[in-house]
Amino acid sequence: MKKFFVLLLAAMMLSVSAFALAEEAGFDEYELGVEGEQEVGFMTMSMVYFQPVDMAPSDLAAPKEGSDLHIEVDLTANENPYSFPVDGWVPYLSIDYVIKDTEGKEVYSGSMMPMAASDGPHYGNNIPLAEGEYTITLYIKSPAENGYLLHVDAETGVEARDGFWTEPLTATWTGWKFVKEW
């Protein structure tokens, strides 16, 4: 029994050491745009970017190679009629984005993928993008588009008896000065 506890203690110490090393070798997130955190519909959202990352399954993700950065939207639910937990991540969203330069010309567009990292679930993607100043607009579509259902009966139903929103919610971050810091 004593050996078990010694081994357990050693394993715990190794885990803590590995975590500390991972923290030291970490990376920096850069805030995207001048708006910072925004209230969008029933959610609080913020955007960051950092170096491109490997993701799995790789056939569903934009590859690290050929990408200049990873963009990420972190979001949590506020009080809402859909019964998403307050301060929890909102699943089943489809989030499209359009990136424009300072002259309003579209330079890149795509979709954010739902994913998880060491800091939790989010929507993001690797993208190619030249250094410069940009505006990014997100178009957040209802979870119903991905087959997410709501109970609407009197006994078990959510507050939102009419279902989800029908037009995409939008959020824009301006004055984003993208500089490759890595």
Please give the residue ranges for each predicted region:
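Bacterial N-terminal signal peptides
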Residues: L8-V16
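Positively charged n-region of N-terminal signal peptides that target proteins for export
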Residues: M1-F4
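Short acidic/polar inter-strand loop motif in beta-rich domains
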Residues: K141-V152
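A short tyrosine-centered beta-strand micro-motif
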Residues: G132-Y139
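Short, compositionally biased P/S/T/A/G/V-rich stretches that sit at domain boundaries
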Residues: E23-P63
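Solvent-exposed serine/threonine-rich low-complexity stretches and specific carbohydrate-binding patches
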Residues: Y108-A116
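Short amphipathic, basic-aromatic surface patches that mediate peripheral association
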Residues: A56, L69-G88
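Exposed aromatic-hydrophobic patches
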Residues: P121-P128
